[in-house]
Design a protein with these regions (language model features):
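Acidic, low-complexity, intrinsically disordered interaction modules
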Residues: 17-63
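Short intrinsically disordered terminal tails
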Residues: 1-2, 67-68
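A short beta-strand micro-motif
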Residues: 2-16
Length: 68
């Protein structure tokens, strides 16, 4: 398991990709708590208060760019 600072999903980095960074505000007042590389996927976890929840998973077969 590796921790990641930023993940970008999509073939066209500048125009059509979705960018997610640790600390970014998302969904209903939550913040991205961590982005984790697992064996066959990347997982994004969000946090609100003390509660951390799984939010999104991305298959490793997708066009992905990561920053550590």
């Amino acid at each position: 398991m590796k921790l990641i600072r930023k993940i970008t999903i999509g073939k066209d980095y500048k125009n059509d990709a979705m960018h997610y960074s640790v600390g970014q505000d998302v969904y209903g007042g939550h913040k991205i708590d961590s982005i984790v590389e697992e064996k066959d996927k990347f997982s994004i976890y969000i946090k609100k208060g003390k509660e951390v929840l799984p939010w999104k998973d991305f298959n490793k077969n997708m066009a992905i760019s990561i920053s550590f």
